[in-house]
């Protein structure tokens, strides 16, 4: 594959390798010292992070979750720290914080518990099989207190069956496959292979992605703060290597019980998972609706191999660690009317064309699917349909195509306190005509497309709010994306580590979306290690980026109080596509009270007609010039077609493309000075740190 020689990840590796060697030496020294004195040393202090940064840097932003997250690169290990690196198609780029720990047989990584815990989640990667489809391999879990093991050792059986996609959209599980779309432009050869002679060849597997999966484990007892969780790769296992990215630890509450309810067991649901429970759940739902009861599903693993259609009912589980719905992806005998060729476990409202569903409340259970490939016509999502006047809370969704996909028109849905991980595509999508709905306190990790999206295709979404959510490590597209719509809000979210063909926060007039109208407010969001490299354009994006493709973006768009930390390339980007550069514009976006802490290149990159205003936008650790202004590339009258308005208070300095030394990051470039350099040298910024107001 072709990689940018300017990419900061490439230059960091040598430094990180040296640092890792020193760290491993120190670990070995500590172990030797403990043996020499004949007594155990105290455990290493727990390092708790959020999105792999100090929690103080993102306080008040993102989801409040019951677990504490620890990065493996901050733990004690006899393995090797890999990364940091941000090049797509690499294991380290998809890791939280862009670093992880690689273990081989006999090696371990140890995490000191920061609080009492009885459950853990391990995010990991192991190799695929040579022909695709994954392998399984063990990972031993033990707990050490004052140098001695306590409790029972446990073994996790890791799998890569739900990891690894390859090639071009819509991707494949086959690492040996030839190009899926030879008629498309391919950046690796800078050509259209089907139109090129001699035909180019490509390294296989081509464009590997989606390296990670995660697994939860109840430990059987509560361990104390300061105990050490040791993850060890046993001597014999199928995996040549095991990469551990992070460990979440939490104290899970006892199962919830509902006595005055329609208990699913009484209708034949099987908590052992041996028999399909779908029909039993239908019976329980019918009984509950007739008698105005909730459906209660006690602890157990329930096999469900189709959709459960819900309308006017509450489904209450014992908790997402206890009540688990799972099943196989099932091939249909003939395509369904909606184009699906598979079905699988999921809870669906009636479709809007059938009147939709109302007053549905889904609480405190897990849905673990069996989706391993992307078929965009398939309805194999965890939750779907149209759900008005409804709520979803306390769910855990894994291994479905999309966690929650809603097709409007529908109104007044609340999605709260839910975890969505390891999705083939989006975590959540409001698709067409979803109104007055809220997504709050949702934690997302490892999606294969946008984390949270509002997509106004054919019908405008309006009056919706994405608030206090965390989105980490989406392997494709954006953390949060808004495609058209009216009067929507994105507030107090935390987004980190997007990988390619998207970035942290995105506003786009594309994919056939209805126009932006009314207002769009993006307020108090934080993006960490965003501003990715766009492989097709061969340029860097912004941590937040606006893309006018189908039409202008000219609504009342305000970005207020956002923080952009450690952006690989730019903090802010406004762009159109070359083929429409003289037809579309981005007008009147207002940036206010924004902090930019570290960019590889610029604070603002403008590659479009239009303009934006800046007030109290402060920047430090800027890698190149404060502004890359290309406009629409026509450069009329010595300027560009994009105007920057300085409303004052924009502090901080950057390099200047015209003279030596530094200048105010914005003032030198106002109103439309052409400073067009899409590929300047990239300077990797320092890690985010407590804010000190810049001057200049």
State the predicted function of each range.
Residues 1-38:
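Secretory targeting and sorting signals
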Residues 37-259:
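Extracytoplasmic
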Residues 160-216, 269, 332-350, 378, ...:
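Surface-exposed intrinsically disordered loops and tails
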């Amino acid at each position: 594959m072709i990689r940018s020689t300017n990419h900061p990840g490439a230059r960091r590796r040598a430094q990180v390798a040296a640092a890792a060697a020193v760290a491993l030496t120190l670990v070995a020294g500590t172990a030797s010292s403990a043996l020499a004195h004949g007594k155990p040393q105290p455990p290493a202090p727990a390092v708790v992070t959020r999105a792999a940064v100090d929690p103080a840097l993102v306080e008040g932003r993102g989801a409040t979750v019951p677990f504490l997250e620890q990065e493996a690169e901050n733990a004690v290990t006899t393995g090797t720290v890999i990364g940091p690196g941000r090049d797509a198609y690499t294991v380290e780029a998809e890791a939280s914080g862009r670093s992880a720990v690689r273990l081989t047989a006999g090696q371990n990584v140890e995490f000191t518990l920061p609080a009492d815990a009885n459950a853990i989640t391990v995010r990991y990667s192991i190799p695929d099989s040579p022909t695709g489809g994954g392998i399984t391999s063990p990972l031993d879990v033990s707990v050490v207190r004052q140098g001695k093991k306590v409790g029972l050792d446990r073994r996790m059986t890791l799998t890569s069956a739900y990891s690894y996609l390859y090639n071009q959209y819509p991707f494949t599980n086959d690492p040996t496959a030839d190009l899926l779309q030879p008629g498309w432009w391919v950046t690796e050869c800078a050509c259209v292979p089907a139109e090129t002679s001699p035909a180019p060849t490509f390294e296989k597997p081509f464009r590997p992605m989606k390296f990670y999966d995660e697994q939860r484990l109840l430990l059987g007892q509560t361990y104390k703060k300061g105990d050490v969780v040791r993850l060890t790769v046993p001597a014999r296992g199928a995996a040549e290597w095991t990469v551990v990215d992070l460990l979440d630890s939490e104290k899970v509450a006892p199962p919830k019980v509902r006595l005055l309810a329609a208990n699913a067991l009484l209708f034949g649901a099987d908590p052992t998972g041996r028999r399909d429970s779908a029909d039993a759940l239908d019976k329980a739902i019918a009984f509950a609706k007739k008698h105005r009861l909730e459906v209660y599903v006690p602890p157990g693993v329930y096999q469900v191999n189709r959709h459960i259609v819900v309308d006017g009912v509450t489904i209450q589980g014992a908790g997402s660690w206890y009540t688990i719905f799972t099943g196989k992806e099932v091939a249909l005998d003939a395509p369904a009317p909606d184009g699906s060729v598979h079905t699988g476990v999921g809870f669906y409202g009636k479709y809007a064309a059938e009147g939709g569903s109302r007053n549905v409340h889904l609480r405190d259970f897990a849905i673990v699917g069996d989706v391993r490939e992307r078929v965009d016509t398939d309805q194999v999502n965890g939750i779907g349909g149209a759900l008005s006047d409804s709520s979803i809370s306390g769910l855990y969704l894994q291994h479905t195509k999309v966690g929650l996909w809603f097709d409007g028109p529908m109104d007044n849905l609340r999605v709260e306190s839910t975890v969505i991980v390891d999705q083939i595509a989006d975590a959540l999508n409001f698709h067409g005509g979803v109104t007055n709905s809220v997504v709050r306190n949702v934690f997302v990790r490892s999606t294969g497309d946008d984390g949270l999206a509002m997509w106004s295709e054919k019908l405008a979404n309006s009056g919706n709010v994405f608030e206090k959510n965390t989105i980490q490590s989406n392997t494709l597209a954006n953390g949060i994306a808004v495609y058209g719509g009216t009067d929507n809000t994105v507030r107090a979210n935390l987004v980190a580590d997007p990988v390619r063909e998207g970035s942290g926060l995105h506003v786009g007039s594309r994919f056939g979306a209805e126009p932006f109208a009314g207002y769009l407010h993006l307020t108090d969001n934080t993006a960490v290690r965003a501003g990715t490299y766009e492989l097709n354009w061969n340029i860097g994006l912004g941590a937040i980026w606006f893309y006018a493709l189908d039409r202008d973006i000219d609504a009342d768009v305000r970005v207020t109080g956002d923080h952009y930390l450690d952006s690989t390339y730019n903090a802010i980007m406004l762009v159109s596509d070359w083929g429409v550069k003289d037809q579309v514009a981005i007008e009147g976006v207002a940036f206010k009270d924004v902090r930019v802490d570290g960019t590889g290149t610029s604070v603002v990159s403008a590659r479009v007609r239009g303009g934006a205003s800046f007030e109290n936008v402060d920047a430090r650790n800027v890698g190149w010039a404060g502004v890359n202004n290309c406009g629409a590339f026509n450069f009329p009258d010595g300027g560009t077609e994009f105007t920057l308005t300085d409303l004052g208070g924009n502090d901080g300095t950057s390099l200047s493309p015209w003279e030596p030394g530094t200048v105010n990051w914005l003032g030198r470039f106002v109103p439309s000075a052409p400073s067009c350099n899409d590929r300047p040298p990239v300077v990797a910024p320092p890690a985010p740190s407590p804010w000190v107001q810049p001057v200049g």
